[in-house]
A protein has these predicted regions:
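C-terminal catalytic lobe of FAD-dependent flavoproteins
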Residues: 45-46, 52-55, 62, 117-167, ...
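Dinucleotide-binding Rossmann-like beta1-alpha1 core, especially the glycine-rich loop
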Residues: 1-31
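Short, hydrophobic/aromatic-rich segments at coil-to-beta transitions
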Residues: 84-87, 141-143
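Core beta-strand elements of the Rossmann-like FAD/NAD(P) dinucleotide-binding domain
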Residues: 91-100, 104
């Protein structure tokens, strides 16, 4: 009932759309060659998929066309607030002056706040590693599965680049955002999830590739699965000094709305042409 209610909200909160509505599925009639017989029914819903790398590249290209200067492979090593502007020093010794500074460093946000801006971070984030495994295609249907484990976490199985299946994700607390990589325990967790749901059984020998990333979650709860994936702003301002906006949290699917809200938060500092 809760799943059906959630899907009803999913179907209707976005208003009119070309995406079909969700529906109930009897597994004896569909996917009986994929799922184990202990699973008798579920629900079908529709979603969209994005190439995250391509989306970021398109945003960068669009920003360049609108006059933005993009400093690739460059690190900010110092930032000083000098009255009504910021003086920012890069690792190539270039200095940039800016009337506004926005810290959108993701999982490195407090590293920037503490070590570069040299102010005390007001917000706490939790660094959570999410890992995926990629295997040869587990089934022929062009459909993704959402599998729920006994720990109440879900794992997605998604057709990937025509010949593969993408399986993930995990949630593991880490101390640093640098160089994330999947652990053996995470591999076993994802493999067991597949073997508990699918007829086809897999092992570590079936893994052809893995990748991991870090999610900067706003720390409000003890359980990593319950920490909010939303975002909050920390606006550091003084009437006589240049503002600093730190962005905590956020996710790719709402990046545009987040960016719009950044402009609203900084509206009084942005000159109107």
């Amino acid at each position: 009932m809760l799943i059906r209610l959630g899907l009803f909200l999913y179907d209707n909160l976005g208003g009119k759309t070309k995406i079909p509505k969700s529906s109930k599925v009897i597994f004896a009639k569909q996917y009986q060659n994929i799922l184990q017989s202990k699973f008798t029914e579920g629900f079908r819903y529709y979603d969209v998929q994005v190439d995250d790398k391509k989306l970021v590249e398109m945003n960068i290209d669009d920003a360049k066309k609108k006059g933005a200067i993009i400093e690739e492979d460059t690190k900010v090593i110092n930032a000083n607030r000098i009255d009504n502007y910021w003086e920012i020093t890069l690792n190539n010794n270039e200095k940039i002056k800016s009337k506004i500074l926005i810290n959108a460093a993701g999982p490195w946000i407090n590293e920037i706040v503490n070590n570069v801006l040299k102010i005390n971070a007001k917000k706490s984030i939790r660094l959570v590693r999410g890992s995926h495994i990629i295997t040869k295609k587990l089934y022929e249907d062009e459909v993704a599965f959402t599998l729920q484990n006994e720990d109440n976490r879900i794992v997605f199985v998604i057709p990937y680049k025509g010949e593969y299946s993408l399986i993930g994700t995990t949630e593991v607390d880490v101390d640093t955002p640098d160089n994330p990589s999947i652990s053996n325990e995470e591999k076993i967790y994802l493999i067991n999830t597949i073997n508990n749901h699918f007829i086809k059984q897999i092992s570590q020998e079936d893994i052809v590739e893995t990748y991991s990333g870090i999610r900067p979650l706003i720390e409000d709860f003890k359980d990593a699965t319950k920490v909010t994936r939303d975002y909050i702003f920390d606006l550091n301002e003084d009437e006589s000094k240049a503002p600093l906006l730190n962005i905590y949290g956020g996710k790719l699917t709402t990046y545009r709305k987040l960016a719009e809200n950044v402009l609203l938060a900084l509206n009084k500092y942005i000159p109107v042409n």
